[in-house]
Amino acid sequence: MVFIKPQGSDTTWIFDTETCGEAAELINAVDGKKNIVISHFHPDHILNLLKVKYDKLYVTKYTKKYTRAGEIVDGELLFPDGIKISQIPSSHSKGALILEYKDYAFLGDATYCHFRLTAREYNVQLLEQMIKKMEEITAPNFCLSHDKGFVQAKESVLRIYRKILARRKNGSPTINVNDFFNEDGGVKESEDSLGNNVKVKL
């Protein structure tokens, strides 16, 4: 969950709502106008919508099947206060949204893989499209929802997904990444922009 109050604006933007009661209390304690952007439809990102008050809600058509409310974002929206909302292709979930503001792009879970009982996988086509979208983002910092290192350099994150894409096999629509992880969920081979080892959950 992220709160953004652009300078000179009377609106607080909130990216995702989480599920715990404390998060709902924090949202309801915000004074003034509140706009909420939901990254995707998974329960850990939307459940508090039932408990909070807001002025506007932005979702994709897939997410609206679950929220039953909100303005559908098809493509991208740019607001006078500098907030930008857009869709991003994702293997993790259909209908993913990201939020950009100044030097930061909040990607939610969009970069994460698809989880099955026996495999962690990326769809090759969606991964290619996701990387292209990430390359087009002008913000130098990416923020990934569940990572220990919430804020990471754009190029550092891109290197990881380019490595994953390079593992694709001819004729296969998916890339298995089971062996790309440490036991704690961190990526085995990743470095930040300074060459330091970092752990990134996919």
Label for each model-derived stretch:
Residues 1-32, 69-130:
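Catalytic core of the metallo-beta-lactamase
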Residues 15-17, 39, 59-60, 106-109, ...:
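Active-site flanking residues adjacent to catalytic metal/cofactor-binding acidic residues
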Residues 20-22, 41-48, 64-67, 93-95, ...:
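Active-site environment of divalent metal-dependent phosphoester hydrolases
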Residues 21-63, 138-141:
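Active-site metal-binding motif and surrounding structural segment of the metallo-beta-lactamase
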Residues 48-51, 70-71, 119, 155-157:
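Short amphipathic alpha-helical segments
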Residues 55-56, 124, 160-161:
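Short, hinge-like loop/turn segments at secondary-structure boundaries
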Residues 128-198:
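Divalent-metal (often Zn2+) His-rich catalytic cores of metallo-beta-lactamase-fold enzymes
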Residues 201-202:
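Eukaryotic N-terminal low-complexity, Ser/Thr- and Lys/Arg-rich leader segments
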